[in-house]
């Protein structure tokens, strides 16, 4: 009986690994395009938290820059859109990539949709979740170069004070996380998981990429 159980467990574990790992992304178009500069437009926010758009947007520059791309400064991009009468993320996403190229001179556009963002109370824990999906499009011809998604869930209850203490701690943590926008901190991890060239099916290394030297 024991060998049978162990064998079944091994099969289930193997099946789980096969389900969880996404197939390798086809980077043919990405390699042909060779983008050097990326314009990140304000993300669409499908979550109920109004901080979703700017929390995720503020987290994207670091991983993209470290990946070797020039990223247009968010403040400059926002002001340029305002001068062109565009202040809503949905309206900006509707602008043709070629038009954005005429305005900014960028090689590619990164479109992000935030599907989950914020902190929720779950029985004995307060959980902050950030989930997003993204598409990188060649702004010179509108061709999709890459797409991916990432989701991070982070709990904040490390209390050993029993059931009542855990309940109180979860409520307090949810309030504190909401006031300090814990989602922004978690979105940094989500952005790296989504955009880092070291992630499975992440964005390829750009022309300015510098390999970190071992110490």
Swiss-Prot record:
Domain of life: Bacteria
Keyword set includes DNA repair: no
S-diacylglycerol cysteine lipid modification positions: 17
Gene Ontology annotations for the cellular component aspect, listed alphabetically: plasma membrane
A Pfam family matched in the record: GNA1162-like
Keyword Phosphoprotein appears in the UniProt entry: no
Location relative to the cell: Cell membrane
Secretion signal span: 1-16
Residues where lipid is bound covalently (N-palmitoyl cysteine): 17
Something else known: Present in outer membrane vesicle formulations which are used as vaccines in human.
UniProt-recorded name of the protein: Putative lipoprotein NMB1124/NMB1162
């Amino acid at each position: 009986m024991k060998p049978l159980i162990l064998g079944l467990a091994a099969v289930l574990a193997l099946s789980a690994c096969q389900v969880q790992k996404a197939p390798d992304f086809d980077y043919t178009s990405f390699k042909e395009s060779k983008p050097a500069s990326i314009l990140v437009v304000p993300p669409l926010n499908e979550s109920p938290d109004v901080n979703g758009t700017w929390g995720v947007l503020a987290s994207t520059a670091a991983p993209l820059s470290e990946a070797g791309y020039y990223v247009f400064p968010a403040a400059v991009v926002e002001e340029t859109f305002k001068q062109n009468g565009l202040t809503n993320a949905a309206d900006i996403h509707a602008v043709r990539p070629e038009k954005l190229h005429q305005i900014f001179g960028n090689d590619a556009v990164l479109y992000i949709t935030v599907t989950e963002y914020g902190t929720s109370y779950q029985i004995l824990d307060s959980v902050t979740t950030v989930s997003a999906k993204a598409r990188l499009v060649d702004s010179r011809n509108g061709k999709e170069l890459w797409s991916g998604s990432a989701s991070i869930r982070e709990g904040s209850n490390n209390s050993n004070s029993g059931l009542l203490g855990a309940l109180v701690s979860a409520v307090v943590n949810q309030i504190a996380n909401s006031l300090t926008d814990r989602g922004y901190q978690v979105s940094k991890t989500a952005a790296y998981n989504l955009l880092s060239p070291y992630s499975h099916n992440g964005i390829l290394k750009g022309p300015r990429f510098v390999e970190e030297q071992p110490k």
